[in-house]
Amino acid sequence: MVDTPFQQPQSLNVRQNRALALAGVFQATQLTHMTAMTGQQSIGETGNFYFEQLIKASLNIRPALNTSTQTLDFFNQLGDIALGLKTLESSINQPFSTTPKSKIPKLPSAKLPMSYAMALLQLEKKVYSNPEYVAVIEKSQQKILKQLSFFDNNYMHPSIIANLAQAYVDTAGQINPRILVRGNAESFKDPNHTNRIRASLFTGLQLAHLWRQLGGSSWNMIFSKRKLLQDIQTLARLQYQMV
C-alpha cells in the first residue's frame, strides 16, 4: 500500500465529499462515452488529463483501508474533477428514464454517461461483496504501482491502461448484466481503444466504491437531487476560488 499522493489544506463537509466522489464516477463514464463515440485520440490533451487523474485516484482507493473521508486526498485539486462535476450537473437537470421499453434502450447520446454511471453504482456493490473480485483488484493495484517505476510514472502508458482494463474484465466484466457501451463499431476492433474504455470504467468502479464508503446510496441520490445539485454548485464555486 502507498500513501495517498496529495493532501488538500481545506476540508469539505460529508455531503460535498460524497458529491465529489460521485462526480468522479460521472467523469469516468463521460470519458468512456467520448472515447467510444469519437475515438481515444479525439478527446485531446484535456480528456487525457482528466483520465490520468482518475487513474491515479483509482490506484489509491482501497477496498477497506481508506481512512480518509476527504475525496480530495485522492486528487490534486477540484479542477481535476471539473468534467465530472459538469457531467453530473447536466445529468441531474436532465434525468435519465429508468424504465426503458427494451433491454437495450435507445438513449440520446447525452444521456449515455448517466446510464453507465448508474450501472457502475450497481456493479460496485456486487464486485465488492465478492472476496475473489476484491482480491483481484488489490493484486492489480499492487502490480500496476510496481510497473509505474519502469514507465517513469507514466500513468497513460499502454501497459498500465491494459492492466486497468484487465482488472475491469476480471471483476465487473464477469457480472451480468454487463455494461453495453455504444460507439463506433469500427473503433472497437482496436484493442487499444477497448482497453481505454474498460480502463475508464474501472476508474469509475473505484470512485463508486469511494462514494459508497462515504455513505452514498442510490436511494439517497434519487430523493436528494436538490441537495446534490446545491453541493455540485458549491464545489464549482470553490474550484474557481482556489485557482
Swiss-Prot record:
InterPro entries per the UniProt record, alphabetical? HflD, HflD-like_sf
Cellular component terms per the entry's GO annotation: cytoplasm; plasma membrane
Keywords assigned:
Cell inner membrane, Cell membrane, Cytoplasm, Membrane
Looking up Pfam families in the UniProt record yields: DUF489
User: According to its UniProt record, where is this protein located?
Assistant: Cytoplasm; Cell inner membrane
Q: How does it sit in the membrane?
A: Peripheral membrane protein
- Entry keyword annotation includes Protein biosynthesis: no
Question: Does Cell inner membrane count among this protein's keywords?
Answer: yes
Q: Which PANTHER family does the entry mention?
A: HIGH FREQUENCY LYSOGENIZATION PROTEIN HFLD
Family affiliation: Belongs to the HflD family.
Q: What's this protein's name? A: High frequency lysogenization protein HflD homolog
Q: Tell me what gene encodes this.
A: hflD
